[in-house]
Amino acid sequence: MTSSASQMDYVLPNELVDGMIAAGGKKSSVSVKNLLIRGFYSGAILGLATCLAITIGIQSGMPWLGSFIFPFGFASIVLFGMELVTGNFALLPMAVWAGKSSWSATVRNWLWVWIGNFLGTAFVAVLSLIHI
């Protein structure tokens, strides 16, 4: 007979933490090239989502309408497997504390993902400036 906990559709807290630790461990070993590419696209997607949310809010005359659009940027980043430095700020220290990564790998990841995010958002900002 199976237990009722195994029939539920939710993830237990300890399973969630284990998944986060595993994700942090995997992220700490990604190559610099992939960190920059994923970080760039992540920053660009978030920048485009911000531009779209602001445009919809202003053009519609209902600023709150943009708040429904912006989360699609975050969802896209997750679904496409991109790297956003704020998420890595949470996942990688957990992997270090669990012994799945090192602080040097964590700082390396943060640095390259931040650079990629910055370049992606700067790219969208330049395109927006050219468009104006």
What residues fall within each predicted segment?
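Short, hydrophobic transmembrane alpha-helix segments
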Residues: 52-62
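Loop-to-helix transition at the N-terminal end of transmembrane alpha-helices
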Residues: 60-76
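The first (N-terminal) embedded transmembrane alpha-helix
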Residues: 36-53
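Membrane-interface alpha-helices at helix entry/exit sites of multi-pass transporters
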Residues: 103-112
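Short, Lys/Arg-rich, polar N-terminal cytosolic tail immediately upstream
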Residues: 1-27
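Cytosolic juxtamembrane amphipathic/interface segments immediately preceding
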Residues: 18-36, 100-104
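Conserved small/polar residues in nucleotide/adenosyl-binding loops
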Residues: 130-132
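Transmembrane alpha-helix boundary signature
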Residues: 80-88
